[in-house]
Amino acid sequence: MIDLRLLREDPDRVRASQRARGEDVALVDSLLSADERRRSSGVRFDELRSEQKALGKLIPKASPEERAELLKKAEQLKADVKAADVEQHEADEEAKRLLLQLGNLVHPDVPVGGEEDFVVLETHGTIRDFGAEGFEPKDHLELGEALGAIDVERGAKVSGSRFYYLTGVGALLELALVNAAIAQATEAGFIPMLTPALVRPRAMEGTGFLGQASENVYHLEKDDYYLVGTSEVPLAAYHMDEILDADKLPMRYAGFSPCFRREAGTYGKDTRGIFRVHQFDKVEMFSYVAPEDAENEHKRLLEWEKQWLTGLELPFQVIDVASGDLGASATRKFDCEAWIPTQGKYRELTSASNCDSFQARRLSVRMRDGKKVQPLATLNGTLCAVPRTIVAILENHQLPDGSVRVPEMLRPYLGGRELLEPVAK
């Protein structure tokens, strides 16, 4: 959540942020009104309690005639205090409810607009000219099926659309990617973590996934647990309700977990293959830093993502995501998009988000610097979302005979294998 003091002091900045996100600007005024009600009801409660305490001291000293009147007044004050307490609680709950609906403040350098209004910051690698090489590229599903690596037919039979099996070299390729990603993250100073896939509502709400993103979250209603769409959620909640020493920051974790997404609103989009699925595995980087270090940490996360994609020998571009496509928690987000030959365009493989103190305030994660205690900043970045990375590798490194060249970086994790070759049917 944002700092309420900032809302009170500069509401126009918050309105501008909501407008840039394409969200309801009237929410800001509703929150301001609720905050004023909360504060005024708090003042009234304190005044009545003070009057009640003062009256309580007078009653023992009063004459019999005065005491009867004072007791009558005390009875009325008791009712007034109780009513004021209820009013204060209701006003406080309303303000909290509205505050949780408000997205993070958009960074001033973020391009304003919707999904297509991003700005390309960098391009890396060379896009292959398959025409010059003399063959038509196959898509990842055709390649994967020929390699005995992907089985979507049985995935659909068992679980429905957007499910799949990784088999044979497909399974080995996932394990190689995960081990390589964890190795890179560990070398960079991240602590590897295997995280829960089920979390309580507070963890999901605290990370900002129960607002505009809630339609994509799986909820186990009977037990009131949520399936995570990213290990960002359990990693952000790992230090919930804790105060961390400033001299121990930054604290960096690399989480590996299954991820579950309903993909609501994507009917008919990316239905072929494993690019957009309901369940996948992912290695996620997560950082806790001092607020003043957040922007530099954001750049570091992006550099680690670029290192990863460069190591996989993939052509990719880096974009500055537009304000309407940020998600509730991020103040700024950089995506790395790999070139997908059969689609003829770049597609998102990684995201790096600066959430500044938004998640930390909601989850009560703070830092102590001397005598000062304050919310810290959290950031997250995808290192390897497995299915999409497999899509990019298969399509970009395919050869005319349907085999796929293994990037040199991955070979030690595949027993030195240089090629993935089609299997006999």
UniProtKB/Swiss-Prot annotation:
The keyword ATP-binding applies. GO terms for cellular component: cytoplasm. Keywords: Aminoacyl-tRNA synthetase, ATP-binding, Cytoplasm, Ligase, Nucleotide-binding, Protein biosynthesis. Pfam families: Seryl_tRNA_N, tRNA-synt_2b. ATP binds at residues 261-263, 277, 348-351. Belongs to the class-II aminoacyl-tRNA synthetase family. Type-1 seryl-tRNA synthetase subfamily. This is Serine--tRNA ligase 1. It comes from Streptomyces avermitilis (strain ATCC 31267 / DSM 46492 / JCM 5070 / NBRC 14893 / NCIMB 12804 / NRRL 8165 / MA-4680). The lineage of its organism: Bacteria, Bacillati, Actinomycetota, Actinomycetes, Kitasatosporales. The gene is serS1.
